[in-house]
Design a protein with these regions (language model features):
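Cys/His-rich metal-chelating microdomains
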Residues: 47, 225, 282
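The canonical Cys-X-X-Cys-His
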Residues: 222, 267, 271-283, 332, ...
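Extracytoplasmic entry segments of secretory-pathway proteins
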Residues: 1-172, 257
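Extracytoplasmic electron-transfer domains, predominantly the class I c-type cytochrome c fold
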Residues: 250-262, 286-353
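Electrostatic cytochrome c docking/interface patches
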Residues: 160-164, 243-272
Length: 353
């Protein structure tokens, strides 16, 4: 083993931890850093909506305030670390004595003055943004009425008779008023990329607004725990040019499409004459149920069960047969649908666009 000779004393350098190589200590420090950061990084997802990726004026203000707080916090953290390092590394000269009662200007400025400036700045910016978020749309702005149910969203447009579910459209570049109600428990309407949360409280009509700077589809979510399927209470906001928005309003007011194939006609008959019509409505037919979502445009929706599964034939068939296996606890009981009729029902529902 390598040894060092210090006068008449030999020292084993391999057994002394202070003599270990610097590369080894750096590798251990890097490994510890990775292990500590891994749990935090596992929560990141490129597909999840983020309030820090704003697509509207409302969320933009929230994101800017967040970044202001973040960088101010980083500055304070850096200041504290520098002072701490200085206190640990710089020793006081032995010939210097502390005079009790002397003015500590540094402590006064760093400990009271700087925090005061930060608090006043953040408070002023917060008040400015709060006032901007409270700036309501004009009287001619479209008004969308959203009602939260366990666990889906009913969507109507003021002045339009039809209804849809779990999907609302807005014109790009325009403010849209959103009136919120709950049919049961407390919910919270949140579109991270467009607007902060607004709670839905029983017996009250709450208002917020949406404004999208660019076209696209933005996922929203109930942000208040509301029971078993709270996680599967999502919705979609589709921002599109004004002409497409007007076309959506026209489709919302029109009767559902007429079946064009024999399978679709058989599916419509099974839907209207079966138990489906007791809970669901399809405009222009004898199905006028008001318990579950209106299915007049179900074929064009982005998902089934408010974000539970994709809207395709396989998932739709599974939902019809027994939605409890897909979204346990929802209010739709298992259906005794004849195996020969199930493809017809799927064909009919997929034609409703």
């Amino acid at each position: 083993m390598p040894r060092k000779s210090l006068g008449s004393v030999s020292v084993d350098t391999t057994s002394d931890p202070t003599m270990r190589s610097r590369p080894e200590r750096r590798r251990r420090l890097l490994a510890a850093t990775v292990l500590c950061a891994a749990p935090a990084l596992t929560g990141c997802s490129s597909g999840a909506p983020s309030a820090l990726d704003p697509a509207g004026s409302g969320s933009g203000r929230v994101a800017n305030l967040w970044w202001l707080l973040f960088w101010l916090s980083m500055a304070v953290f850096a200041e504290v670390m520098v002072v701490l390092a200085w206190a640990l590394l710089v020793r006081r000269r032995p010939d210097v004595r502390v005079r009790h009662g002397q003015p500590l200007r540094f402590v006064t400025v760093a400990g009271a003055g700087i925090p005061l400036v930060i608090l006043v700045t953040v408070y002023a910016v917060g008040l400015r943004d709060l006032a901007a978020l409270g700036d309501e749309p004009g009287p001619r702005a479209p008004t969308i009425e959203v009602t939260g149910h366990k666990w889906w969203w009913e969507v109507r447009v003021q002045g339009v008779e039809g209804a849809t579910a779990n999907e609302l459209h807005v014109p790009v570049g325009e403010k849209v008023r959103v009136r919120l109600r709950t049919a049961d428990v407390l919910h919270s309407f949140w579109v991270p990329q467009l607007m902060p949360k607004t709670d839905l409280i029983a017996g009250e009509v709450r208002e917020t607004w949406l404004h999208a700077d660019r076209a696209g589809s933005y996922r929203g979510q109930c942000a208040e725990y509301c029971g078993t399927q709270h996680a599967h209470m999502a919705f979609l906001v589709v921002a599109e040019p004004r002409a497409q928005f007007d076309a959506w309003l026209a489709r919302l007011a029109a009767p559902a499409p007429v079946p064009r194939t024999d399978a679709q006609r058989r599916g419509q008959e099974a839907f209207v004459r079966g138990s489906c019509a007791g809970c669901h409505a399809v405009r222009g037919t004898d199905a006028n149920g008001g318990i579950g979502p209106d299915l007049s445009d179900v074929g064009s929706r982005w998902s089934i069960g408010a974000g539970a599964v994709p809207n395709d034939g396989g998932h739709l068939g599974g939902w019809i047969a027994n939605s409890q296996t897909v979204k346990p606890g929802n209010y739709m009981p298992p259906q005794s649908v004849d195996a020969g009729r199930l493809p017809d029902l799927i064909a009919y529902l997929q034609s409703l666009k």
